[in-house]
Every structure is written in C-alpha cells, then in structure tokens.
Curated annotation (Swiss-Prot):
This is Methionyl-tRNA formyltransferase. Keywords: Protein biosynthesis, Transferase. It holds the Pfam family Formyl_trans_N. It catalyses: L-methionyl-tRNA(fMet) + (6R)-10-formyltetrahydrofolate = N-formyl-L-methionyl-tRNA(fMet) + (6S)-5,6,7,8-tetrahydrofolate + H(+). GO terms for cellular component: cytosol. Attaches a formyl group to the free amino group of methionyl-tRNA(fMet). The formyl group appears to play a dual role in the initiator identity of N-formylmethionyl-tRNA by promoting its recognition by IF2 and preventing the misappropriation of this tRNA by the elongation apparatus. Belongs to the Fmt family. It comes from Neisseria meningitidis serogroup C (strain 053442). (6S)-5,6,7,8-tetrahydrofolate binds at S110, L111, L112, P113. The lineage of its organism: Bacteria, Pseudomonadati, Pseudomonadota, Betaproteobacteria, Neisseriales. It comes from the Bacteria.
Length: 308
C-alpha cells in the first residue's frame, strides 16, 4: 500500500518512522521548507525531513498546496492509496484531499471534538482536563471536523507539562496510525464515525502575552498555565525589568497580596495569588538557563514583600 506522508515537527517524525518500520511503501514525504532557527538563525531542516532523508525517502517542501498546480500534479503522479498527515502546518485544499484513493488520515492530539485547532495539548492542560488523547481522523475541508477512525485516551497526570504530554501522545499517535493503516490494508476500508455536535471547543494558537502570569488569578489556574506553556511560550513574570520564565511550581495554602513575594529560600520562591500561593521550584532568568530554585537562591535572593 502506497502512503504519502505529510508532517513537520518531532511529533510527525515519530509517526513517519513508525509507518516506515511497519513496511508500508512511502513514495513521497511532504514537509515545510527549511527555516532559520536558533540564536545563529541557521537554516535548519524540519525533523520530518531529517527522518525522511535518513530513511532514504523522497522529500518535497512546497511553500503551499492551495492553488499549486505543480504540487497537485506531483501528488497525482504518485498514485497513493492514502495520505497520513501529522502537524504539517499547511492547509490541504479539497483537490489535495481528493487525490489519494482512501483520502487523508490526520493524527490529532486531542479527543475530538474537544480542542480542535492549533494547540490542543496546551489547552487541555490549561483547562484542567483529566484526560486527553489522540484521534485518527478522516480529513475533510473543515478545521479538524472529519470523521474519527480511532480514539486513544491518555490520563493527564497532576504534574504533566505540555512537553511530557506531547511525548506520550507522539508515541500513541504513531502506533495508532500504523494500526489503522494495517486495517485499511487488510480490509480495504476504515470504519469512521462522525464527531458529536456537542462538546466542540477550539484550541487557539498560543501567544507570549497570554503566558504572562496574572497573579490575581488563583494559584491552581496559574499552576496549570505554567505546565501548559512549558516549554513554549513559557509562563513568565517581569523581574528587574526583564522577563523571567517560570518552569515549575506547586500550589501552597498561604495568603497575601496578589504578586507579593512571601518567602525566597532553597525550598522555593513563594508568591501570593488571588487564591492561595505558588511555590516556584524551577525558573529561568532572562538570558540564562533553566535552574532549580536551590541554584537560583544560592546566588541571589528576592526580598520578601517584593511585588512581581
């Protein structure tokens, strides 16, 4: 069975490797163009391109697929049975969705219809959801509105960051899409069900500004945001005129004026919130590396009563 693969980041690269390891023929891999990255802004290939080249696969990097006759013709020439799409980052117009014999399967990191859109992992943690998961979806022209082929659940742990949930769902998604491709190969079809009309939510793209901590919110809400925005865009506060990223914290039953530093020691930096307080245990000063509060407190202190 011929499988076109379209994806860009690590989440997608894991699925590509799994599909290849399962023995499916992959005549074409699509990924986004190389982009400048890092402090040196060096042109860097996306993880899917790196994985494809290691696997000896053909890689193409069109800037867009909409109104791109050359790309459309390229896809048609492959005569693929199905396309697997994972965090590709480009819109697939209907004429592209129609090319593969069995359409396009998307690996989506939420339990649809909850958290359609760009940042489902982060929004699930931020909202305090007890669980999330992966859906393999038959793509249509809407935003994550297609019929669901399979659903795979993951219980969000109280300390899970977005990065940790991402890594768990990456493995789940890779295994899930392989299983569905194997079913398609053996039975010639997939049993997809329509998404419920109730319970639809949208996972808006993250912004640096919303990651700024508002100490008037409850400690529980802020703690979830810290985990949801870890590693990027990273929850932050302004300290000495510069942004300081907060990487890990826990809720403690202390009271004070919102934003007031209640204590600063090797045990933690405790800051009052609208309800209860946060004990910060890991942070990242502007221009510096991530560090434990023990390392931070060894070289400096934040005076009790300081308002962040």
């Amino acid at each position: 069975m011929k499988v076109i693969f379209a994806g860009t980041p690590d989440f997608a690269a894991a699925a590509l490797r799994a599909v290849a390891a399962a023995g499916f023929e992959i005549p074409l891999v699509l990924t986004q163009p190389d982009r400048p990255k890092g402090r040196g802004m060096q042109l860097t290939a996306p993880p899917v391109k790196q994985a494809a080249l290691e696997l000896g696969l053909r890689v193409e990097q069109p800037e867009k697929l909409r109104n791109n006759a050359e790309a459309l013709q390229m896809l048609k020439e492959v005569e693929a049975d199905v396309m697997v799409v994972a965090a590709y980052g480009l819109i697939l117009p209907q004429d592209v969705l129609d090319v593969p014999k069995h359409g396009c399967l998307n690996i989506h990191a939420s339990l649809l219809p909850r958290w359609r859109g760009a940042a489902p992992i982060q929004r699930a943690i931020e909202a305090g959801d007890a669980e999330t998961g992966v859906c393999i979806m038959q793509m249509d022209a809407g935003l994550d509105t297609g019929d669901v082929v399979s659903e795979h659940r993951y219980a969000i742990r109280p300390t899970d960051t977005a990065n940790e949930v991402h890594d768990a769902l990456m493995e789940i998604g890779a295994a899930a899409v392989v299983a569905d491709l194997q079913q398609l190969q053996s039975k010639g079809r997939l049993n997809a069900v329509k998404q419920p009309k109730e319970g639809v939510t949208y996972a808006q793209k993250l912004s640096k500004e919303e990651a700024r901590i508002d100490w008037s919110e409850s400690a529980a809400v802020i703690e979830r945001k810290i985990r949801a925005f870890n590693p990027v865009p990273a929850a932050w506060v302004e300290y000495q005129g510069k942004p300081m990223k907060i990487r890990r914290a826990e809720v403690v039953a202390q009271q004070g004026a919102a934003g007031e530093v209640l204590s600063c020691s090797a045990d933690g930096l405790v800051v009052a919130c609208g309800e209860n307080a946060l004990k910060i245990t890991e942070l990242q000063p502007a221009g510096g590396k991530r560090m434990s509060i023990q390392a931070f407190a060894a070289g400096r202190t934040i005076e009790v009563g300081t308002v962040l």
